[in-house]
Amino acid sequence: MIKTTKMLAAILVCSTTPVLADGHSQIWSMAGLANAPSSSKMMEGMTGSILINSSIDLWDWSEAPEGFPTLVTAECNQSIALTAEGAPFGGVGVCSMMDPDGDLAIYFGEITPQLEYIGSLTAGSGKYEPYVGQKFVGTVTGMLKTGQQMYHVVAAD
């Protein structure tokens, strides 16, 4: 159970991209596949641990508007704080991606004790630049024993 909880928290990083709809900035829903971590490190202390993971995630942007790619990959890195018993109680994650047009986006977020990922677009170029600061919430919808997961992301506002 502790291993599953650690993996769930560690791979929860997810993202989405903002768009214009009806004159207002909005974020479309997306699905993501977090691969098993390509690297993993545990820093163990007296009262808890920090799990540091990296993975390459696949993002399904099939609901994206015209001009945005419908499928992208992102490099994601997470640091998850765990109690001495192995339960997550917070963390951070960063996902960086460059789309086929060469536009880039960096997403940052906090991983909550409820295993949600609350984040925003922190930096972006090209079509992403006008939407820096857009917020989203991600939740895991399924996980395999290998650490691979499906997650879903929606607008936070």
Feature locations, PLM:
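Sec-dependent signal peptide recognition
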Residues: I2-A10
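N-terminal signal peptide c-region/cleavage motif recognized by signal peptidases
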Residues: T16-P18
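Beta-strand-enriched cores of mature, soluble protein domains
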Residues: D22-D157
